[in-house]
C-alpha cells in the first residue's frame, strides 16, 4: 500500500517534483508496464486539479491504442497524425492546447474537455506512448505543466 502526501495547492514546480518522486516509488521494481501506467494515471488523476481525464495511449504498430486511464470511456485507437494525441505521437513533440475546439482535427472523446496536454514518452529516441491530460477548463495547462509532465515522461520511460 502506498500513501503519498502531495499538496495539490503547492506551486506547480513542487507538485510536479513530488509527482515524479511518487511515480518512481510506485513503479520501482515493478516490471509490468500496464500496472505502472495504471498507477501513474491514478496518481495524476488524484493530485492534478481540474482534470477530467488522465491516462496513456500506447504505440502499437503505426497507431495509438488506449492504455490505462482515469475518466470517462475514451477512443480506443488513434492514428498517428490525427487529433492532439496522434499529432504528439507523430511529431514526438508536446502538444499544449489551450482550446481544443481551435485544434484542427481534434478528436472529441469527451465533449466536456476544453483544453488538453499531450506529452510523448520516448525511449531511445522513439515514441512508445503518450501521456494525455484533459480539462473541462479553457487554458488549464501552461508551459509549467508541460515541463512537469515531460519530466515525468522521461523518468518513467524505462518502466512502461
Residue locations for each model-derived region?
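Short loop/turn motifs at secondary-structure junctions and domain boundaries
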Residues: 48, 109-113
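Regulatory sensory and allosteric helical modules in signal-transduction proteins
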Residues: 59-109
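A short, aliphatic-rich beta-strand micro-motif
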Residues: 115-122
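Juxtadomain coupling helices with adjacent low-complexity linkers
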Residues: 2, 135-160
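Intrinsically disordered, low-complexity terminal regulatory regions
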Residues: 1-68, 155-160
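Sensory-domain boundary capping and coupling elements
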Residues: 122-135
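Short hydrophobic/aromatic beta-strand element in the GNAT-like acyltransferase core
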Residues: 53, 118, 130
